[in-house]
């Protein structure tokens, strides 16, 4: 059995499984305090959109061919939401990129491309709404079965353009991000593109949607890896600063004690330098006794 055949046979179960994983990740992300509020919000919405995408896609398949009133509305609402959520996920990835590059000290030229991604998102949403009344993207027959329209390729071109713009930003400014994040962002853009190309020639299999959600899961995992690296770096920096502060405090204490001893000994010619000689002899005795440098 081919991969496409396997997905076609078990895609409803795969959708349910992946949506459950994304639902758990949504709750975990919302509860995570280590992430910045803006990044936590973007990731949580991204994962929630992935859950809804698979659930609506699943409903579209379950009620396909159901000519009842319920089937009529479920199929139409589900297909509309599948198309919209595909665009919305790319919109959230754009916001995620903006958040990642904010505060990196780079020029704002990349924002022009990401803003254009947002314009494409709005344009795609408007065309999707228009298609509901004109049949630009798809239509339904009397048996409530979905059929692609000649203009269906447009709904593939817009996400494709957004993905290429996102890839160009990631490639150009990859040195500002960690390796796991760069890899996950590239996969998040490239894998759905490949799936979309296959989807053009294969009907009845949600390769694109399943691949998108799979990449969202990978994006989440790599975001956690990046977060752990940032926390570890911050911890090491804090330890270094603490050690330097302790060393400065110790040096200051030695200088203060030395100044006090010198001031006291300066009052009497006999005791002048006495404390220094005692300390020197004590160090020699300790070294001959085999004590460590730290002890001495």
What spans do the regions from the language model cover?
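Short aromatic-rich membrane-water interface segments that cap or initiate transmembrane helices
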Residues: 5-9, 73-85, 144-156
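Interfacial "cap-and-anchor" motif at the non-cytosolic start of specific transmembrane alpha-helices
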Residues: 169-241
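Alpha-helical transmembrane segments in multipass membrane proteins, preferentially the mid-helix core
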Residues: 23-29, 92-96, 156-176
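Hydrophobic transmembrane alpha-helical segments in integral membrane proteins
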Residues: 1-24, 152
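Membrane-interface helix-boundary motifs at transmembrane edges
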Residues: 29-44, 99-114, 170-181
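Acidic/His-rich, divalent-metal-binding segments that scaffold phosphate/diphosphate chemistry
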Residues: 237-296
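Hydrophobic alpha-helical transmembrane segments of multi-pass membrane proteins
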Residues: 13-96, 117-133, 185-200
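Membrane-proximal helix-loop-helix units in multi-pass membrane proteins
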Residues: 92-95, 100-160
């Amino acid at each position: 059995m081919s991969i496409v055949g396997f997905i076609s046979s078990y895609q409803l179960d795969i959708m349910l499984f992946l949506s459950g994983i994304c639902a758990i990740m949504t709750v975990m992300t919302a509860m995570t305090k280590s992430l910045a509020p803006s990044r936590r919000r973007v990731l949580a919405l991204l994962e929630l959109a992935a859950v809804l995408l698979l659930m609506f896609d699943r409903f579209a398949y379950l009620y396909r061919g159901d000519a009842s009133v319920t089937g009529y509305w479920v199929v139409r609402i589900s297909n509309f939401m599948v198309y919209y959520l595909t665009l919305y996920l790319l919109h959230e990835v754009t916001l995620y990129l903006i958040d990642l590059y904010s505060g990196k000290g780079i020029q704002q030229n990349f924002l022009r491309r990401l803003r254009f991604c947002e314009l494409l998102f709005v344009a795609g949403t408007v065309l999707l709404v228009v298609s509901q009344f004109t049949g630009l993207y798809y239509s339904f027959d009397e048996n409530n079965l979905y059929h692609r329209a000649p203009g269906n390729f447009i709904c593939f071109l817009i996400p494709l353009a957004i993905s290429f713009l996102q890839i160009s930003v990631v490639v150009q400014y990859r040195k500002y991000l960690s390796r796991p994040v760069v890899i996950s962002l590239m996969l998040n853009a490239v894998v759905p593109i490949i799936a979309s190309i296959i989807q053009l020639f294969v009907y009845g299999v949600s390769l694109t949607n399943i691949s998108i959600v799979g990449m969202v899961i990978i994006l989440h995992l790599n975001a956690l890896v990046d977060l752990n690296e940032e926390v570890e770096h911050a911890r090491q920096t804090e330890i270094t600063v603490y050690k330097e502060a302790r060393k400065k405090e110790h040096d200051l204490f030695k200088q203060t004690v030395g100044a006090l001893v010198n001031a006291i000994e300066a009052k009497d010619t006999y005791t002048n330098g006495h404390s220094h000689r005692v300390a020197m002899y004590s160090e020699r005795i300790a070294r001959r006794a085999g004590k460590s440098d730290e002890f001495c």
